[in-house]
C-alpha cells in the first residue's frame, strides 16, 4: 500500500471528477441541441478553454524537459486516438444519444483495453478475463438492444468512443516504459487543440450569444477540474482503492440527464450497466493482483 494512502480524500476527488464530467456532458449536449452547434465546434472550444485553465499546472511539469522524447510519432498517434474518442463522444451527445445510454456504453472501454492488451501488447490475458470481457459486452448488448425495431446506428457512437479511448490507454501503457507521466500529459495538452482545430474547420460555426459562450466556458472549466481531480485522486490514494469510485459517473450522469432533459432510463440500463461494472471490477481486481505479484517477484 502507498505511504500516502488517504482513502477519504481519494474517494472525494474521484467523486468530484465524476460530478464534473456529468456537468460537462449535460452542458455539451445542451449546447449542441439547443444552439445547433456542431460537436466539432463544441470539442474545440471546450478543450481549448480547459487548456487555458490548466496552464498553471502545465508549467509545474517543466514543459521543456517534458518535451524531450524519442517517441514523438507515437505521441502523435496517441493523442490522435484520444481526439477521435472525444469527437465520437460529443457527436453522440449532439445526435442526441441519451446521456444514460452513452455513459453506460462508454464504460466498456476497459473491455476493449483487455482485448487490445492480449492482441497488441501480447500480454497473457487468460480464460477468466476473456470470459469477463465477453460478459461485459453482453451487458452492453442489453443496453443497446440492437434487435429492437427502433435501434439506431448512432447508438454505437459511444462504443466507438470507448474503443478509441481504450486504444489511447494502451498507447499510454506502451509509452510508459520510455517516457515520464509528465511527458504524457504535456504532449496530450499541447496536441489536442491542433487536432480538434483540424476536425472543426470544415464544419466551423462561431458560437453566437452570451448564453452559449457561458455554457462552453463552463464546460471547459469543468473539464479541467475533472482532469485535475482524477490526478489528485490517484496521487493521494492507491489506484486499486480509487478505481471503483469511477463507476459513480453512471448515476451522476443519469441524474444530470434527468435534471436537464427529463430523461428517465429504462430498467434494462441498470441490468446491463451492472453486468458491465461487475466485469470491469473483476478485470481491474485481476490486474491489481497481477501487479502486486510482479512487484513481489522484483
UniProtKB/Swiss-Prot annotation:
Gene Ontology cellular component terms for the protein in this record: membrane; plasma membrane
Record's subcellular location: Cell membrane
Keyword Transmembrane in annotation: yes
Keyword ATP-binding on entry: no
Membrane spanning residue stretches: 8-28, 35-55, 79-99, 101-121, 125-145, 151-171, 184-204, 211-231, 258-278
Membrane topology recorded in Swiss-Prot or TrEMBL: Multi-pass membrane protein
Domain EamA: 10-144, 156-284
Record's keyword terms, sorted: Cell membrane, Membrane, Repeat, Transmembrane, Transmembrane helix, Transport
Family matches, as InterPro entries: EamA_dom (IPR000620)
Pfam families: EamA
Family membership: Belongs to the drug/metabolite transporter (DMT) superfamily. 10 TMS drug/metabolite exporter (DME) (TC 2.A.7.3) family.
The protein's role, per its UniProt record: Transports riboflavin into the cell.
PANTHER family documented for this protein: ACYL-MALONYL CONDENSING ENZYME-RELATED (PTHR22911), SOLUTE CARRIER FAMILY 35 MEMBER G1 (PTHR22911:SF6)
Protein name: Riboflavin transporter
Organism (species): Vibrio cholerae serotype O1 (strain ATCC 39315 / El Tor Inaba N16961)
Source taxonomy: Bacteria, Pseudomonadati, Pseudomonadota, Gammaproteobacteria, Vibrionales
Encoding gene per record: ribN
Amino acid at each position: 500500500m502507498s505511504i500516502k494512502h488517504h482513502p477519504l480524500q481519494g474517494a472525494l476527488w474521484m467523486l468530484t471528477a465524476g460530478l464534473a464530467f456529468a456537468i460537462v456532458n449535460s452542458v455539451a449536449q445542451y449546447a449542441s441541441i439547443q444552439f445547433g452547434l456542431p460537436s466539432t465546434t463544441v470539442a474545440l472550444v471546450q478543450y481549448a478553454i480547459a487548456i487555458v485553465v490548466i496552464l498553471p499546472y502545465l508549467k509545474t511539469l517543466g514543459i521543456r524537459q517534458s518535451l524531450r522524447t524519442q517517441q514523438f510519432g507515437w505521441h502523435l498517434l496517441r493523442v490522435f486516438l484520444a481526439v477521435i474518442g472525444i469527437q465520437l463522444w460529443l457527436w453522440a451527445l449532439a445526435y442526441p444519444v441519451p446521456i444514460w445510454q452513452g455513459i453506460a456504453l462508454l464504460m466498456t472501454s476497459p473491455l476493449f483495453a483487455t482485448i487490445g492488451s492480449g492482441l497488441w501488447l501480447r500480454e497473457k490475458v487468460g480464460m477468466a478475463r476473456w470470459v469477463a470481457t465477453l460478459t461485459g459486452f453482453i451487458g452492453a448488448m442489453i443496453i443497446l438492444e440492437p434487435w429492437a425495431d427502433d435501434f439506431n446506428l448512432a447508438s454505437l457512437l459511444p462504443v466507438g468512443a470507448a474503443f478509441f479511448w481504450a486504444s489511447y490507454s494502451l498507447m499510454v501503457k506502451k509509452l510508459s516504459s520510455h517516457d515520464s507521466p509528465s511527458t504524457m500529459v504535456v504532449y496530450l495538452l499541447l496536441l489536442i487543440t491542433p487536432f480538434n482545430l483540424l476536425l472543426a474547420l470544415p464544419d466551423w460555426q462561431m458560437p453566437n450569444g452570451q448564453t452559449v459562450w457561458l455554457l462552453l466556458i463552463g464546460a471547459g472549466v469543468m473539464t479541467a477540474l475533472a482532469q485535475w481531480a482524477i490526478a489528485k485522486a490517484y496521487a493521494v490514494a492507491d489506484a486499486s482503492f480509487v478505481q471503483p469510485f469511477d463507476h459513480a459517473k453512471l448515476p451522476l450522469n443519469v441524474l444530470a440527464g434527468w435534471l436537464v432533459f427529463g430523461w428517465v432510463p429504462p430498467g434494462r440500463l441498470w441490468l446491463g450497466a451492472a453486468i458491465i461494472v461487475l466485469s470491469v471490477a473483476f478485470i481491474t481486481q485481476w490486474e491489481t493482483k497481477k501487479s502486486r505479484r510482479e512487484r513481489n517477484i522484483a
